[in-house]
Amino acid sequence: MFGYRPDGILVRGIDPIQKIIPHIMTLRYDAQNMTHYDCECAPLDVFIREQEQKGERFNYMHILIAGIVRGIALYPRLNRFVMNGRIFARKGIFISFVVKKRLNFTASDSLVKLEFTGHETLLEVRDKVDRAIIDNARTEANNNTDKAARLLTFTPNIVLKILMRLIKWMDRHGLIPNVLLKMSPFHTSAFVSNLKSIKGPSIYHHLYEFGTTGLFFAMGKESADTHRMPVEIVMDERFCDGFYYVRALNELKRLMENPQQLLTPLETLPEDVEVADPYRFFACKK
């Protein structure tokens, strides 16, 4: 409330136009832009084979998530979100994705959210992703999100509606408990969908109005003709301008196609300047 949230820092040092934009486009899905990138598979395949000879196993999902984490760390404005007309800088980097317990029509899904610092190497990202998949792929496995969802479904429909409206109201006003924010996969820096793993095409996935998701990445099966993997990206335009997005996403593509750069940690994290110097737009010009 009053600009305070346990999961974010209010960004004050923004220009007037950017401050007004969230009040013009109040809904996240009304402010979403979409773009398409084709990533060359050849350098990824060469890298994966070379690492396999050294005893390290990687896949495209590992590289994509590691690239997103590194890209957000290098371009911290990507890690902002809009809530109740205000722009916040997120505390921590979070990636959410779905784990399918079995590849059949009746198998259930688990929603997983992982936290990163931005310093991680590709190996550290891989280990964290693989552990989450192993822990949640078991049929009997239930993470905290699964347990909370199951508990809510035991309530009558009218009660569930009231509870969800209350949670959304609390979220808008910064009153939602931090334990729920940590549990919610919808309060995340980016959602990732690996449709390539089920031989599906990439899609433009909408941004969720509930929560704070600002980016959605979906990668699909590579083309047999061009040997390129499609990656569709949907983004909230309210907290970043086009110039910043283009630079950041081009860097992400470069990292994806040069994954060896992700083997070394990022020692220094760039600051979100408008958070570090919140009153720079109000400083007196000499």
Describe each region flagged by the PLM.
Residues M1-K286:
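C-terminal catalytic/motor cores of large multi-domain enzyme assemblies
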